[in-house]
From Swiss-Prot:
Lineage: Bacteria, Bacillati, Mycoplasmatota, Mycoplasmoidales, Mycoplasmoidaceae
Entry domain remark: Consists of three domains, a large central CORE domain and two small peripheral domains, NMPbind and LID, which undergo movements during catalysis. The LID domain closes over the site of phosphoryl transfer upon ATP binding. Assembling and dissambling the active center during each catalytic cycle provides an effective means to prevent ATP hydrolysis. Some bacteria have evolved a zinc-coordinating structure that stabilizes the LID domain.
A GO MF label: adenylate kinase activity
Annotated binding of Zn(2+), by residue: 131, 134, 151, 154
Protein name according to UniProt: Adenylate kinase
Domain of life of the organism encoding this protein: Bacteria
Region (LID): 127-164
Amino acid sequence: MVAQFNKFIILGPPGAGKGTVCKLLSKTTKLVHIASGDLFREAIKNQSVIGRKIAAIISQGGYVDDATTNQLVYEYITTNPLPNGFILDGYPRTENQLDFLNIKLTIDMVFELVVSDLNKLITRIDNRVICNNCNSVYNLLFQKPLVENSCDQCSAKLVKRSDDNKAVVKARMELYQQTIQPIHTYFFNKQLLVQIDCFLPLEEQLKTIKQFIR
């Protein structure tokens, strides 16, 4: 049986675990994980004009403007091999991004990681570290690297993101809640929205998503 082309989205506030779920999913399926955050960090790493602009916005807990985000995401989708489709991580976040996406693509299903305890989420983020080379994500509470301060994938140093602090997390959560409601409502009305508790075991979260893969 030939695999079909799946077009998925995963939504959720910062720290809900979108990246972790998607990376584990991509290891066991042919779905390509497309994270807007990774695209931003790659642009920042390249020190391009867009990258410097993005760095300034993210450091203050804001979101990158829609035009830049749309450009980076769509260019990735149209210029990279996607054998069984993709899962978009953290995109779209605004109505303008949603309008752009609807012109370009038809989405099959949307998974929303729901946060029921903000304090628990803040604790999770306070203990998050990333690889400064390949952007792999770890958590010092429940997903530690095999070697302290060293990435399992490339052995590079692990660092804490500048925006992983309580004040910025709260600011990003407030902004997320303000902007996500129209996105949530749109996909809910289309009967394409599946909500998943972000504090469930990862195996259960993955099982829920995998049942929709064609």
